[in-house]
Amino acid sequence: MTTRKRQIKNFTLNFGPQHPAAHGVLRLVLEMNGEVVERAEPHIGLLHRGTEKLIEYKTYLQALPYFDRLDYVSMMAQEHAYSLAVEKLLNCEVPLRAQYIRVLFCEITRILNHLLALTTHAMDVGALTPFLWAFEEREKLLEFYERVSGARMHASFIRPGGVAQDLPLGLCRDIDSFTQQFASRIDELEEMLTGNRIWKQRLVDIGTVTAQQAKDWGFSGVMLRGSGVCWDLRRAAPYDVYDQLDFDVPVGTRGDCYDRYCIRIEEMRQSLRIIVQCLNQMPSGMIKADDRKLCPPSRCRMKLSMESLIHHFELYTEGFSVPASSTYTAVEAPKGEFGVFLVSNGSNRPYRCKIRAPGFAHLQGLDFMSKHHMLADVVTIIGTQDIVFGEVDR
């Protein structure tokens, strides 16, 4: 009896959904030719929680915490988008101090996001040290979150009409101290990675995206700017006080993983510039809109007046009504253009809330980005896309 040996080169590989480099619950079905990827098919929906439908059963204020839990790495940026959408429907003007506080914390959020994105990406590729060093800095930023909202992550701090409460005493001083030492932490991160021979071998010319491909696939944020397209909503369509602040928009040339890494590093430096300007320019004044149908009375007034207590109770149970209309409002979140399409029918609950998550578009491009690359490069490409499945699956 003769045995015949056959060499199999073409096979299908299941990557995830419990793979440590999958950044959550990603399941990839990879068609392989030896070690080379011929096709990558993402299977999404494993973290679907029906957020958009749940929002329809909540008041406008009760819907806000859902946005913290979409991309759970850049929380306040999403609160910001939703709050701006509600304010646009209400034609509400936010006090200048509240606008500066919002921008301050959105840039803190950007640094939080990029620190995690860069260092987990490095860990996927094989560099462990940056991850441990960066988490020390993230801890300081999460402490700032905790001091303004009481929560380290899901803050619900940016609200329609302003912010939940004013900055506590000493916080601005501590944020200023952080900005003075953080630039040298970025330098340390760059010393480990930017010129590292192995890091460059794993990232240069991997996952290349041309400017036209980025536009065709609906990429935004770092994924778009890495391909040489200078598009940043903070510049192109400024919101709050971004038009009064001075910062640069870093743009790549080759559109590969290394360019996107360099852009995220530079964006952290630009966020530091914005934070310092916010601290220096922040005026005194109110932190909520002077609209009693939208913003609750202060705690001290509630303790003195029964009417104020009733007013507070009404706002948090019944909520406020929004005129029948619709709006699409987008912000430059750390991962790209995060948009909210909000439809009101004149009641105290949203009729429809469609969420435009940047990671959803980026994940669809994984197939063409990883085609004819090695299996190990797929991990690099997922890392450079900075995917979080809370916002992809919603």
UniProtKB/Swiss-Prot annotation:
Quote the record's miscellaneous comment. A stretch of 270 kb of the mitochondrial genome is duplicated within the centromere of chromosome 2 resulting in the duplication of the gene. The expression of the duplicated gene (At2g07709) is not demonstrated. It is also probably not RNA edited and therefore differs in all the positions known to be edited.
| Single GO term (MF) | NAD binding
* Protein name in UniProt: NADH dehydrogenase [ubiquinone] iron-sulfur protein 2
Places the protein is found = Mitochondrion
Which superkingdom is the protein from?
Eukaryota
What PROSITE patterns does the database record attribute to this sequence?
COMPLEX1_49K
A Gene Ontology term for the protein's cellular component: mitochondrion
Q: How does it assemble?
A: Complex I is composed of at least 49 different subunits. This is a component of the iron-sulfur (IP) fragment of the enzyme.
Tell me which Gene Ontology terms the entry assigns under biological process: mitochondrial electron transport, NADH to ubiquinone
Q: What does this protein do?
A: Core subunit of the mitochondrial membrane respiratory chain NADH dehydrogenase (Complex I) that is believed to belong to the minimal assembly required for catalysis. Complex I functions in the transfer of electrons from NADH to the respiratory chain. The immediate electron acceptor for the enzyme is believed to be ubiquinone. Component of the iron-sulfur (IP) fragment of the enzyme.
